A protein has these predicted regions:
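Buried hydrophobic residues that stabilize the cores of well-folded domains
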Residues: 14-144
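Sec-dependent signal peptide recognition
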Residues: 1-9
Length: 144
């Protein structure tokens, strides 16, 4: 069984969250060729919508999610600022997700700080390994 996160999966997640009535958040998706490229999250504060988060999505040639970038709204500068980035890599038995945090001093994403590996080991059984970077040097298994 091939595990992939496609453009359709991202669109479904958006539509499910956008139709939920149980929160004070509103969602605006910008779509291109049937794919969600940007998802903005706004909060209803005293009947005024304020920007909170923005997600940007990049897909590979097979329409699989390859990058999800999260940005936070800076009220002082009135701009979206990078927070973290998730990079997706696919294999026959599953996929991995690597996270890199934004380094404001260097104005770029840093090294991978966390990684999750998802692999099908049996029919309907998925193994998940969670790694964290230790002292900025090596990835250490934290849970599985």
């Amino acid at each position: 069984m091939e595990m992939i996160i496609t453009a359709a999966t991202v669109a479904t997640m958006f539509f499910n969250s956008a139709t939920s009535e149980s929160n004070n958040y509103f969602y605006n998706a910008q779509m291109e060729d049937g794919k969600v490229e940007t998802l903005s999250v706004m909060k209803n504060d005293c009947n005024m919508l304020t920007n909170k988060l923005q997600y940007r999505f990049v897909y590979d040639s097979q329409d699989r999610l390859s990058v999800k970038e999260a940005l936070l709204w800076n009220e002082r500068s009135m701009r979206w600022e990078p927070d973290y980035r998730l990079d997706y890599a696919y294999a026959e038995d599953g996929f991995s997700v690597s996270m890199r945090k934004w380094n404001k001093k260097k104005d770029e994403y840093g090294e991978v700080t966390e990684k999750m590996d998802y692999a099908m080991v049996l029919d309907n059984v998925m193994a998940i390994n969670h790694y964290e970077c230790v002292k900025g040097e090596t990835m250490e298994l934290k849970s599985n």
